């Protein structure tokens, strides 16, 4: 995003020809998956895009995903709330589905 934003600011004649909106303003409207195969890259993605824009990725049906899906998320040693956000919260929000639809009711 830094390179695109730099072009937007420095060369609007090339980059901002059809849109006066800064490319960084689109963050929060774009979603990313966690399957980046690098702990530092995942940390950076979360820091730049925001945890609310990142969700678990598996690369299914392709055989290039993590050996254990979610292991990259676990490796970051995030809080339980942050892990829950990445494992299911962001996806449920994006799909406009309530958590209760999938949660087990332990009160019965």
Question: Model-flagged regions — what are they?
Answer:
Residues 1-27:
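Aromatic-lined glycan-binding groove of carbohydrate-active enzymes
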Residues 31-32, 36-55, 62-108:
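Mid-to-C-terminal alpha-helical segments outside catalytic/metal-binding sites
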């Amino acid at each position: 995003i830094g390179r695109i934003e730099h072009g937007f600011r420095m060369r609007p004649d090339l980059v901002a020809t059809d849109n006066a909106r800064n490319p960084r303003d689109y963050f929060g409207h774009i979603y990313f998956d966690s399957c980046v195969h690098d702990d530092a890259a995942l940390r950076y993605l979360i820091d730049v895009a925001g945890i609310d824009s990142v969700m678990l990725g598996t690369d299914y049906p392709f055989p290039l995903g993590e050996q254990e899906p979610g292991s990259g998320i676990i490796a970051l040693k995030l809080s339980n709330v942050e892990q829950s956000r990445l494992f299911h919260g962001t996806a449920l929000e994006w799909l406009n589905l309530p958590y209760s639809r999938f949660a087990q009711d332990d009160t019965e």
